[in-house]
């Protein structure tokens, strides 16, 4: 937004849990973001419970508050990624004739996004199959990700101590249920390092076990295994350097794998509405990844899948397929669309390319 509309004012509306406030307080653009709190309780899954009665009441009570807030802020446009805050804000924005852009990051939309999509001006989605859930007002933007511009693969590989003929396997589980992935890597490690250099992002809680697994390796193989808790500042370099990635299937992970063009073995997080399972299957169906269900992730299965991808020609075909799915400039596309909505100009998403 800073580049698409220099000098524009940005207001961030968050909830009462405090997470959003901390997010804004720690953001590099915090001096340009004004935080506002909307008192809305999270809505629960509908069912035969007290929440099936309370949720509609909570929603109805929150719409006037959202109406008042938008009347005070008078935004030119509203952007939301869904969630429990989105419904009252989108309803209030529609009533006030404020254009709204909703973004859905997963192949299978969440309940809130499905509901508010009917009231939004435009709905941006990360994956083409999601268009069917929002007929008439949706377009494919991709997922906003970090920039990979200017990263040289040879230089990135050199920074991790790789020789030209080495294969780099990068393993990471994000913040969700990484213990199962760590255990599979630890048991498979002696065989893995025979074929790959392994960069394993084990999380803070996994570092002790990763260190023990490294010490158990023969001296000649220890240099082929590197464990780190996280790799925030060098993650882009790691993905560019990688020959194969083992990871979860969140929207951002899938988008970054596609932007870089790296083949992957995806282990979808099995909870949170099973969104990651649908994301993974899209990449699998497009030939860019293989999938291991979370409950089938064992050292034996991990070894079988990595060994099947030792051959360069199969990995190269998967890399090409991933690259065809990449939308590395999604953030700018969303920003341009939002500015056009705010200014009443032609929408970039409707202009033929």
Tell what function each PLM region has:
Residues 4, 32, 94-154:
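Active-site-proximal region of nucleotide-activated glycan assembly enzymes
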Residues 6-61, 141-143, 204-206, 293-295:
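Conserved nucleotide-sugar phosphate-binding/catalytic loop shared by glycosyltransferases and other
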Residues 23-27, 43, 162-247, 277-281, ...:
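Donor-nucleotide binding loops and adjacent catalytic segments primarily
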Residues 75-77, 239-253, 262:
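Acidic donor-binding loop of glycosyltransferase active sites
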Residues 150-162, 314:
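A short helix/loop element that forms part of the nucleotide-sugar donor recognition site in Leloir-type
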Residues 292-293, 297-314:
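C-terminal "capping" alpha-helix adjacent to the active site of nucleotide-linked donor transferases
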Residues 314-328:
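A short, well-ordered alpha-helix in the C-terminal region of glycosyltransferases
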Residues 327-353:
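C-terminal alpha-helical cap of glycosyltransferases
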